[in-house]
């Protein structure tokens, strides 16, 4: 019911802003490589390289990564938000002035109304997108387009990058596990680095690079398994390579594990600006 209520509340903003179909028609195929920035504890060490190569890739960042990138002066092309909770909306409760220019915020249409309030308050460019939910399709808003967004904002960014015809998808900060010191997020994370450290029971899973095991929890494990299923389908049906350049956290089976430096030097050879 929360999703239905918030969708109805957000509907005027959806129909008065550009559609998802319009985004695809204007942006499809303009870049070969997408970097998906998640908010795992390994993100911090990748920020200097990301800043150096930012102009050579299309950057999709999670809502929670957005304030971190802003702090370090790294401008993403897209900021994605999937969840419908009020605490998630708070990632947009800030004002970064000129930094936001040319960033497109892609937000699921059932998002909390505070999300829209913060976006409008700072004149940010945004698009509300919908999944294939029955109650949404009943309204016949086909013109605005639909897409399956998965269970996490990283899935959403991955699908979006596929729809925009990227040939290489690079994940960073996609730990899906706790750091060695027990932190669940980077030091700059808005809700504290240990926000999820004691929230769930810890489970062991194979580590990045097959080097032993790391601690995770059941929600991250579900995200990991769904991502692995997606990568298997991508490998089977598309000419797209998926790289896990997190250099930490859990192993995501099927993703090509490479240092982020290797990916930057070998895949990012031209300036998109």
Model-predicted segments: where are they?
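Active-site/ligand-binding-proximal alpha/beta "capping" segment
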Residues: 113-172, 176
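N-terminal donor/sugar-recognition subdomains of glycan-related enzymes
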Residues: 1-36, 41-58, 67, 71, ...
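Acidic, Ser/Thr-rich peripheral helices and adjacent loops at domain boundaries
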Residues: 80-101, 129, 186-204, 262-271
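A structural signal for short, well-ordered beta-strand segments and their strand-loop junctions
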Residues: 61, 127, 168-173, 180, ...
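Short hydrophobic/aromatic-enriched beta-strand-loop microsegments
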Residues: 58-61, 75-84, 106, 124-130, ...
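Non-catalytic helical/linker scaffolds that mediate oligomerization, partner binding
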Residues: 157, 170, 174-184, 188-195, ...
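Short, acidic/turn-prone active-site loops that include or flank metal/cofactor-
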Residues: 63-66, 81-88, 109-111, 130-134, ...
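Glycine-rich phosphate/pyrophosphate-binding loops
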Residues: 65-66, 73-83, 161-185
């Amino acid at each position: 019911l929360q999703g239905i209520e918030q969708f109805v509340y957000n509907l005027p903003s959806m129909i008065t802003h550009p559609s998802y179909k319009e985004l695809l028609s204007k942006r499809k195929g303009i870049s070969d490589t997408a970097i998906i920035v998640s908010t795992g504890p390994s993100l911090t060490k990748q920020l200097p390289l990301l800043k150096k190569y930012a102009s050579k890739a299309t950057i999709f960042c999670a809502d929670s990564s957005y304030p971190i990138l802003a702090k370090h002066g790294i401008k993403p092309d897209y900021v994605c938000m999937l969840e419908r909770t009020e605490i998630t909306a708070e990632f947009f409760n800030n004002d970064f002035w000129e930094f936001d220019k040319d960033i497109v915020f892609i937000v699921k249409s059932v998002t909390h109304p505070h999300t829209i309030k913060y976006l409008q308050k700072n004149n940010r460019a945004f698009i509300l997108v919908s999944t294939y939910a029955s109650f949404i399709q009943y309204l016949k808003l086909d013109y605005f387009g639909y897409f399956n967004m998965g269970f996490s904002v990283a899935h959403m960014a991955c699908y979006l990058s596929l729809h925009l015809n990227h040939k290489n998808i690079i994940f960073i900060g996609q730990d899906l596990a706790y750091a060695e010191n027990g932190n669940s997020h980077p030091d700059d994370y808005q809700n504290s680095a240990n926000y999820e450290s004691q929230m769930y029971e810890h489970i062991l899973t194979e580590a990045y690079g097959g080097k032993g095991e790391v601690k995770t929890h059941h929600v991250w494990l579900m995200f990991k398994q769904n991502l692995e299923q997606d990568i298997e389908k991508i490998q089977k049906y598309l000419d797209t390579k998926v790289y896990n350049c997190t250099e930490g956290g859990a192993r995501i089976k099927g993703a090509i594990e490479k240092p982020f430096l290797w990916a930057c030097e070998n895949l990012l050879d031209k300036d998109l600006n």
